[in-house]
Amino acid sequence: MEKAVNEIVTVSPIEVFKNRKRILKNPLPFHHENFEKYGDTFKVNIGVGGKVVFTKDAETIQYILQKNHKNYHKSSLQTKDLGKYIGRGLLTSNGGFWRVHRRMVQPAFHKRKLQGLLGVMFKSIEQELKRIKEDRDYDVFPLMGDIAFQVVAQSLFSADNLRKRMRRLQEITETNQKMLIKEMRQPFFKWWFHLKGEIGKHLKLSKEAQELLDTIINERISSGAEKDDLLDMLLQARYEDGTPMSRQQLIDEVLILFTAGHETTANALSFTLFLLAKNPKFQEEVFKEVSKVDFSADLMEAISQLNFTKNCIEEAMRLYPPVYVIDRVSLETDKVKGRTYEKDTVWLMSMYELHRTETCWKDPEKFDPYRFQKGDPKRYASYYYPFGAGPRMCVGNNFAMFEMVLVIGLILKKYKVGTQMREVAINPLISLKPKSVPLQFSMR
């Protein structure tokens, strides 16, 4: 290990290379070991000229994401590496381009607009839950994936005749994600991936996804139909000069919303159900709350009454944040907590570690939804980031939370869930996934 100028330990490229197989499979233990050894912030020399700093320090993270966010953009990990597979949109852009498109897309996710999508959500969720048979064991991860997939597909396109094409789109995004992870975690071998044609093969898949979406958009425009879905909202969105998005931009935004809109939700739902299965006391409290709610009336009103259900989801996302690492790159040299960091320093901020830090949380490894009942939720604002923070906070956070509250509420109103597992095995890819979540369902 090397000492940096400002006394921050630097993990050498040799150490990274020695641990490459572990890192490729699951980087979280490697992160944790280094945080335990070297403190809340350390550097990693990946051997390709990059300056990478890992941190779980709450003050540092708040400074980068909120207080001085103008000096920090998303790094090339997203704008270039991820962007080449899913296009240039809200998730993969910076600066003026991002600001203009955020202003265009944001209105589609206002609570007033989302109220019109709640019926679509509810119908999609109920339809998928019919697959659950009483007194059976299920791996809920694929089940939650199917629910989230149907919700985002119906909310985007409100059409039942697209299922086959949507499945193909899902296959492409999952395949490309695995390739992207290989590139990110093994930067030494990018030249080899290019030489073997692996990257080229996956870029062809991205082109197929774009062509598929282009066809769907053409069909919508040709039909002349007006539907109160997200695609319609994007088609009607206008720049300040009154012009619509270009076709390519529309395709990119739709692909990004599709990709980001179901995977993270499925992950959070799976972890929430597992934790409630492990903690029947909290599960029963959710059941009591849900039993008093009428889902056949005003769905927004129903969701607003499920506060403890929401607390359980919030606590699950603390322990298992879907976006477990957030990246930024500094535009100019900056001083953070008394230390100077050069321009172009890449910051990797571990939400997984921050959300389990004893200086921020009492009994951090314990599942305790009550912690989100007590006092003002703003007190967590400096160290709880399930949807990111600052101007780059996830545009779909309300959409995701409404959906998750409905799913958990509807399941636990009808079923008890149990588990024999003490812990769930995790699979950190672009988002934090469980490997499998086998639960026992029994009718109430």
Region annotations inferred by a language model:
Residues E2-V100, Q115-Q127, R163, Y383:
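N-terminal membrane-proximal hinge/A-helix region immediately C-terminal to the signal-anchor transmembrane segment
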Residues M1-V11, H73-T79, F97, K113-N267, ...:
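Cytochrome P450 heme-thiolate monooxygenase catalytic core
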Residues M349-D376:
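Conserved cytochrome P450 K-helix/beta-meander segment immediately N-terminal to the heme-binding cysteine loop
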Residues T264-E289, N397-K413:
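Cytochrome P450 catalytic-core helices
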Residues N19-F42, E211, T215, S296-K337:
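Conserved cytochrome P450 K-helix E-x-x-R motif and the immediately C-terminal K′/meander segment
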Residues K111, I221, A225, M300-N307, ...:
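Conserved, non-catalytic sequence blocks in retroelement Pol enzymes and Pol-derived host proteins
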